[in-house]
Amino acid sequence: MTKHSGIDPLTQISPNQHVLIRLPSDNLKIVELKANAIVSLGKFGAFRVNEIIGYRFGTTFDIVYDGVEEEFVKGTQTMIGKISVLENRLKASSPALENSSENNRGLINLGSVVQEMSMAEIEAMKREAASGDAIISKMIESHKSFHQKTVHSQEKYLKRKKQKFAKFFTVEYLDSSGLLHYLIEKGDVLRVMDISQESLGMALNLANINSNGQYLCIDETGGLIVYAMLERMFAGDSNSKANGKIVVVHENEHPNLDLLKFSSYSDNFIQRHVKTISVLDFFEPAKEADIKSLFKPLSAEEINDLKSNKKSAYFRRLKWYHNQLSNIEVAASSFDGLLVASTLYLPTLIPRLGEKIHGSRPIVCYSQYKEPLLELSHSLYENLNYLAPSLLETRCRPYQTVRGKLHPLMTMKGGGGYLMWCHRVLPAAEPKLHQETLEKSEIKNSDEEGDEDAHKLDQEKQVIKRRKPNEDNEKL
């Protein structure tokens, strides 16, 4: 991500980046803001990207159609409107509440009876591109028993109508927490292994992720773990001078890091700081001599003499050659931490990966089930190379407040997964004694044994002396 005409892409909306748009219904949508493009939000309207460039993230915009020429999104009936900035999302399209009742006793719970405005009239206003505020105000005027509702009931009614007819939206920065929230709301819980925002943040903290660290990772969440690690290491800045690196070990032919397409990092930046390697190449890398015997790089003159088809084949082989040498280098490296989110059998995998971790460095494993981590912790208890394996579970219960009431949110998502955390240690070897020390120790032990034998002999003589007078008395 680079600055565009003085715009800071970390705090301000800039072109050619992915953002999170929060709709009036509180649903989320990921949109790529291409310069001079038009973004359609379906029934909520459409707008031009250039009109929101430069505003700060978190700004709420309203789509208005007053004095706008009719122009529709190509292939749809969605009309393109102008953008106006709202001070507060909560105040958007909120007609003033004047009259209310102390209770709902006189209400008639039949919408067709109390609502004089028909659906045909509402659809006609929508086709005329009327604002959400105008539609909601008209519905309130046509509602016979609206003023017989309590204030709380009126607020709930307005909230429902705003979610349906309002045309405002909020642009938010697409960070790892927002991306995870979007995936969960979308229903991709299995894709991210049921991880919660709290578990994700706890894993990054326990793994001690920092900008200049070298980390080993197994990510089966589609790239969410790597996305969060990059955010923690470089804070979304493609111009960062930090030299941190992430090595991603994968079991398939190609790694699944699909979610990195939503990041604002350039391809060169990701290639420089994220290295992928298969499990086989990591544990059993090829020998450097064998690689060099299979391929020999050519000089610049020899490359120029090649034909076009042979030249392309040569560059493919050259890429393979450098990749194999890089795999050998990675397999021989040591790392500052290990972060695993995988369905592989951890009790045999973690000890193998742990050999590549520096001493006094953390190891963090995530699983949506407790049993695999429990079995892993039991196996690590018996291994002196790992210190204090601990199981953690995070729970965050949001509360909602109503007038005079406070209770937990009844529709919250369960689960969130479990974490196993320990430290890689290097046990000190037993000290070797000097030869003279060993000889003195042996002499001392032999002297002590001799003293013990002499003491036992004296005790036996005393026993014999006590027995002899007794025997003489018996004879007499």
From Swiss-Prot:
Protein location: Nucleus
InterPro entries (alphabetical): TRM6
Domain of life: Eukaryota
GO molecular function, a single term: RNA binding
Entry GO terms, CC: nucleus; tRNA (m1A) methyltransferase complex
Region (Disordered): 433-476
Disulfide bonds, paired cysteine numbers: none
Biological function: Substrate-binding subunit of tRNA (adenine-N(1)-)-methyltransferase, which catalyzes the formation of N(1)-methyladenine at position 58 (m1A58) in initiator methionyl-tRNA.
PANTHER family given in the database record: TRANSLATION INITIATION FACTOR EIF3-RELATED (PTHR12945), TRNA (ADENINE(58)-N(1))-METHYLTRANSFERASE NON-CATALYTIC SUBUNIT TRM6 (PTHR12945:SF0)
Name of the protein described by the UniProt record: tRNA (adenine(58)-N(1))-methyltransferase non-catalytic subunit TRM6
Phylogenetic placement of the source organism: Eukaryota, Fungi, Dikarya, Ascomycota, Saccharomycotina
